[in-house]
Amino acid sequence: ERKCPIDGKKVPSCIRYKTCSIMSGFGGAGAFSDGKYNITNDFGGDLYAHIGKENAIELMEYVDRVNVDYGGAGTKLYSTEGTRFSKLCLQNGLHLLQAKVRHLGTDINYVVLENLYAELKDKADFYFHSPVKNIRTEKGGYVVVTEKEEFFCKQCVVSVGRSGSKWMEQVC
């Protein structure tokens, strides 16, 4: 069984082990997950705190449509709303968090990510294993500062995933 060697002491950060894409690269940990996508503000993050609950749900539903369009068409969307289990929880004084969940499964999730990358690779520049120190606005665009160089762009999509979420909170 593979295990990430980062322990915080001897190995403080990613050593970019060649066969390991557990937390980074296109899809990051999601490339090896079971492909469950939650559509809810009740758990899983606080995007709604920045853009409002309705906008957050709209974005999650957009991501769901993209997942379906890029290979997840035969998968099911589950919901806790109005279920027998939801009623049973209420009868017993429990509050069931409301969510819709698209379960792609590991294999289909990987196909979706492959299809997305194939669609985007010629339309955008991807930089993997390029730790970003800072991002600043400048001359109607953005300057992305890495350990080795600086990049200027008119539009910038920062996709840090779980492994970079704490850093992203500091930058924003």
State the predicted function of each range:
Residues 2-122:
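Conserved N-terminal/central alpha/beta ligand/cofactor-binding core
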Residues 107-171:
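Predominantly flavin-linked oxidoreductase catalytic cores and closely associated redox partners
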